[in-house]
């Protein structure tokens, strides 16, 4: 893609998200979503091939349907209340349908089917944008209307998302699909705590974005897209491969890594609100995520896939890829747990 055109498209994507995050007017929210959607399609098709086109088409149809539902209920709420303000009380039925539309945009279960397919069909860099930046705008609207959301609806979606995020990733060998199912599970954790502590949802989103960004950057550095290719990288870049394995454990929420912080605090907050079954179900289903991450770690670190190469060690050439941002990102993705006592300010 032509660099000036790419810069313009990225600025449009960023502008659309910023409009959604900063506005309190429903019409501007819809405009921001549409700007973001129309600008992200060329990024998804950056590598022009049939799979990328199919993925971009699936993404466009899903997001367009969600935007249509959202706009329809914005108008119905306007007729009911006579105002466009996001923070005002919503009509209960409008709140349910708006939550459903935003869940479609986020990829929450049972509207999650597009996430793995779209992520698998696009490049790693496009998948990184899809699974991180594209989550900010819908979550910001859910954050603003969290006081009017139907609790039964959002808690059901969150439990289903964590379950499907765990089950879906069990039989995957494609790293992009594994990250997609991980994203579905993390979105479930964020929406579970949204009604009780919206600030904690922002903390969870921040840590998730840092961990996912670091993991994708390491995948792109190693040019790996499958578990088989990941297992072949230990003799080329042993340090990077080791970091990927630690990051996988952090994404799974294994203590004492950074990914354990949001899960720990969410379970604690839900327990304070006298919800016993909810954190129990979340903790049990989170083991599914940890299991497929540990299995991926095992196949990568302790086994080797069959190879036709008669040489045991591949040549190690000097690395020419710049890694300026990786060291601080790796530290933040793995070593934030000692800072957890400082998070008491969220209370």
Curated annotation (Swiss-Prot):
UniProt subcellular location = Mitochondrion inner membrane
* Top-rank EC class of the record's enzyme: translocase
Gene Ontology terms: cellular component: mitochondrial inner membrane; respiratory chain complex I
Q: Name one GO molecular function term.
A: NADH dehydrogenase (ubiquinone) activity
Q: Reaction(s) catalyzed by this protein?
A: a ubiquinone + NADH + 5 H(+)(in) = a ubiquinol + NAD(+) + 4 H(+)(out)
Membrane-topology annotation of the record: Multi-pass membrane protein
What name does this protein carry? Answer: NADH-ubiquinone oxidoreductase chain 2
In the UniProt record, the gene name given for this protein reads MT-ND2
